[in-house]
Amino acid sequence: MVILLICFLIFIHELGHFIAAKMSGVPIARFSIGFGPALLSRKIKGTKYCLSIFPIGGYVMLDINDISDLYRIPLRKRIFYMLGGPFGNIAFALVGIVSLNLISGNISFYSMIIDPIYQTSIYLYKIIYSIGLIFKHPDQISGIVGIVSQGSKFVGMDIIRLINFSILLSVNFAVFNLLPLPPLDGGNIVIYLFEKINPRLLKLHVPLAVTGWVLLIGLLLYATVLDVGRISAGLCA
């Protein structure tokens, strides 16, 4: 169930990018639910909508041929497009909190508007604060394996716990993607801002992106090793 939740939140993230692109006029070649060969597809107003064979998340493909086409798109539109994904995850968290309040019978202006914003802000603060603690306690990092393992234990078959966990995980997705590390959304925004500082800095796009990928993959591998170690220790205990 947690794996399906992660896939769904990835889709929500990409849907946020898609909506932001449509709102700002950024050209989209394809929007797909899932990956791999398309089972169903339809082209509407220049965008190909696909339902792909592997229903794991989704993706948005911009209608560009190379990096130069990307930089012809106005800076504000590129940044708005990149922010769309994290905002999509934040919006999902807000809806999740509203849903919990509705389930509990709390129907008021406070429970529908103020409380979701307040609780989401608290989640954001705690997650951002915890990022700083990672440098003090790097052995506490957890990756996908740990999320699935711990999340499955927490959620079980309880719908309320599932919603609570999805809210927390969605806000985590938003914060993680805003980290200033290419190829994450935050890293791409930083690279785009180089354009404002000095257009010649744009030549750093590719080397920074490659470096970012290496660091990100290294971090994920490190987190996976820690997760597997914790799970193994738990099984042996």
Enumerate the language-model features and the residues they cover.
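Small-residue-rich helix-interface/hinge motifs
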Residues: 1-68, 169, 179-184, 189-195
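Functional transmembrane alpha-helices
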Residues: 68-90, 94-173, 190-211, 215, ...
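Positively charged, phosphate-engaging catalytic surfaces used for nucleic-acid and nucleotide handling
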Residues: 176
